[in-house]
Amino acid sequence: MTRRNVAELANPKVQEVVVNMDKLEEELAPHAKGVDIALAAFGVGKGSAKMADEEVRKIEITYPTAFASAAKVGGARVLAMMTAAGADSRSWTNYLRNIGDKEKKSEELEFDFLGLYRPAVILGNSNTPSAVGFVMPLFHWAMPSRYHSIHKNDLARAMVAQSEQAFLALAQGKGPAAPAVKILEYKEMEPFFVAGDSDAP
């Protein structure tokens, strides 16, 4: 699901669904029927500091919640939601408070398994200068692991692999009896990284 055509998704194994974001839940519903796992990576990206808080909340909370709601109605048991390091609905900073609210909204939907993925600086995308990708790892030793930079492909690998593991456990009757929420920061995502292959799709 995307708001515009993405050339990188041109693959016979991928079905791209372009939707009107303001009618997201309605337009996504037919495509969500029968899904097992939903992965959401909504984010404001570059320029968020210049945006009104109302617009930021629409992108960070309203749209992801609508997406997740459609997936839940369609039958999804597992939701992987990208949030951010430091997310806290009680934070004094608008951004982290908004991301914390996103997490709360996701929890309220009560998926059988909810994975909240909290990356810090995401490398390999147009919003992060390439120089940052070189400099950030040099300082990893001096900062808590939760704030380590992560390549977008490693983040995607972690979201997919952990979600598949969670769904398999549920399908085999080994999952939790009640809805489970797991927060995954850098250390929890690291086992799914591919060393020396961060630029591979």
Model region roles, listed by residue range:
Residues M1, V17, L39, A80, ...:
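Hydrophobic/aromatic beta-strand patches that form the interior of the parallel beta-sheet core
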Residues T2-R3, E27:
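Short secondary-structure capping/turn segments at boundaries of alpha-helices and beta-strands
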Residues R4-N5, N11-P12, V35, D88-A200:
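Oxidoreductase cofactor-interface core, primarily capturing Rossmann-like NAD(P)-dependent enzymes
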Residues E8-A66, A70-V73:
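NAD(P)H-binding glycine-rich loop region in Rossmannoid oxidoreductase-like domains
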Residues V44, K50-E103, E108-L109, L114-Y117:
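Conserved Rossmann-fold NAD(P)-dependent oxidoreductase catalytic core, especially the SDR/UDP-sugar
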